[in-house]
């Protein structure tokens, strides 16, 4: 694992996830569309950690978002060091790092990186199904390939649909014009993906999305920062108006925790170079905090708040 200037939210650093309940991994790069070129979100893990540098000094403070105190048993295992000239090797290293966390009995929380990161992340759950993917994103992400690349950031949900251990999918926050063509929308719906648009969430809240999750399901949560409105998180590569609000996503996470078990979580597509104020990183980092708390209190979750 790579070294860190600071850990996420002041959680202790550890190279070994054994004994932890939740283990964070930074993943700057996975699969670029331009060979040898680092991701537009490669700096995001460091930005997410830096956004909460003061948070580690306040573990005894009450957190009103999570309704309690920060969970115990959380460690930051640093970054998975990849090689942008060797995407297959990088994906294998990501999958191996996540598998190591799972084998240690901890829940992995991944700080991406772009939206190609969920593919090797999900791959680590082979043999651990059946799983439901709950995605927050402005885009469908069902492209089979882009310029011959099948593992890039337009394809994570397509690749997830091909993994036998993933049996359900709920996609929340879609809006506007993105990468999806008519064929991809048809394929997603034919496979059984439940699509909940951003407009539906604005009209009815996150209840309709939560209704698509089977009680007791084991869920992988993936949050693309562009799923939120650019007024909330402007630091993304693909801005689109009409996105989800911060508390939509918080309510979704805690709603999931009340009816399902969250077995893995990732956040991707923060673009630090479009975030000069650091507000996007702060907002995204707080979503990660809520994700950690939701993992901790979900049925069968590993830890409780302290």
Language-model segments: what does each one mean?
Residues 1-306:
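Conserved alpha-helical scaffold segments that buttress catalytic/binding sites
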